[in-house]
A protein has these predicted regions:
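SAM-dependent methyltransferases
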Residues: 1-25
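A general secondary-structure signal for short beta-strands and their flanking turns/coil
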Residues: 19-23, 48, 78
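C-terminal structural segments of small proteins and small subunits
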Residues: 76-109
Length: 109
């Protein structure tokens, strides 16, 4: 016999739960690396999402919303970077940003 719970609603933990933190490693494939134009495209993509996104390389971490920060990473062709996102749309942000990087920032070189 199961206990009668009446009209007591199930607890809602969504407001107290922390948003997920996800990360993904990707490699810069384009000839000129993460230069100004590529960094600008990356920032514009990152700004579409609510999640906080960081880019890490060689122990240095910068905001995905900072063109100068991204360029200061010095990520040339073949550089491995880690994308780290925290927020409710973290997976979508990582998917979109990784696709942008892996496509060579849509550059023709």
């Amino acid at each position: 016999m199961t206990p009668d719970t009446g009209d007591i609603p199930a607890p809602d933990y969504s407001s107290s739960a922390s948003p997920p933190v996800l990360s993904r490693i990707t490699v810069i494939p384009n000839k000129r690396g993460l230069h100004a134009r590529a960094a600008a495209k990356f920032v514009m993509m990152a700004e579409r999402f609510d999640s906080s996104v960081e880019v890490l390389r060689d122990g240095q971490s910068v905001s995905a919303r900072s063109i100068m920060g991204l360029m200061m990473l010095g990520a040339g062709k073949g550089a491995e970077i880690e994308l780290r996102a925290e927020g409710w749309d973290a997976k979508e942000a990582l998917d979109a940003l990784a696709l942008l990087v892996e496509s060579g920032f849509d550059e023709q070189d």
